[in-house]
Amino acid sequence: MARYTGPITRKSRRLRVDLVGGDQAFERRPYPPGQHGRARIKESEYLLQLQEKQKARFTYGVMEKQFRLYYKEANNRPGKTGENLLRILESRLDNVVYRAGLARTRRQARQLVTHGHLLVNNKKVDIPSYRVSQYDIIDVKEKSLSTLPFQVARETQGDRPIPGWLQVVGGRLRVLVHQLPERAQIDVPLQEQLIVEYYSK
């Protein structure tokens, strides 16, 4: 399955969740697109589970095959499967770059990683799905600091709250991973138990 690259606001309206963050077009029309978008449709248990899974996939920009592998890994870990799944998704490098305020959206964060602007523990990493670990240090490459995205990131530092499991160090935009997130530190509007129920069938 190819990665979705279509209109993200339309997808947000279909899934009834802001997939971008601060999407004003979605805020104006937070109902499904199309002629009957406002109509109330009786939603089955399966449909609710499917929608929740799709919300998670599109929020983090993950394809179905990869998402299923994440679920299997989460299910094999000790603890709650749903929370494990969210922790795996949050620890992706593209998400950490977004969470740290180095990018305005996860899509932009994915591009910044893919284009080789980031170092993890002084080694270039250009794989968005790379998983960070506790005590990792993420830096912007020296020559990339002067590019527009990172200039904007410096100027807008403090505009968006940084989660407690991360720390951003001043003008150099160094990101310190103090720990992997607890469920209470993950503010995505997802009911992860519905995802677990979807894959448990």
Swiss-Prot record:
GO MF term list: rRNA binding; structural constituent of ribosome
Family: Belongs to the universal ribosomal protein uS4 family.
Every S4 RNA-binding domain range: 91-155
Record's protein name: Small ribosomal subunit protein uS4
Function noted in UniProt: One of the primary rRNA binding proteins, it binds directly to 16S rRNA where it nucleates assembly of the body of the 30S subunit. With S5 and S12 plays an important role in translational accuracy.
Record CDD domains: S4
Pfam families: Ribosomal_S4 (PF00163), S4 (PF01479)
Quaternary structure annotation from Swiss-Prot or TrEMBL: Part of the 30S ribosomal subunit. Contacts protein S5. The interaction surface between S4 and S5 is involved in control of translational fidelity.
PROSITE patterns linked: RIBOSOMAL_S4, S4
SMART domains named in the record: Ribosomal_S4 (SM01390), S4 (SM00363)
An annotated GO BP: ribosomal small subunit biogenesis
Any one annotated GO CC term: small ribosomal subunit
Gene3D superfamilies: Ribosomal Protein S4 Delta 41, Chain A, domain 1 (1.10.1050.10), RNA-binding S4 domain (3.10.290.10)
Keywords attached to this entry: Ribonucleoprotein, Ribosomal protein, RNA-binding, rRNA-binding
InterPro entries: Ribosomal_uS4, Ribosomal_uS4_bac-type, Ribosomal_uS4_CS, Ribosomal_uS4_N, S4_RNA-bd, S4_RNA-bd_sf
Organism: Rhodococcus opacus (strain B4)
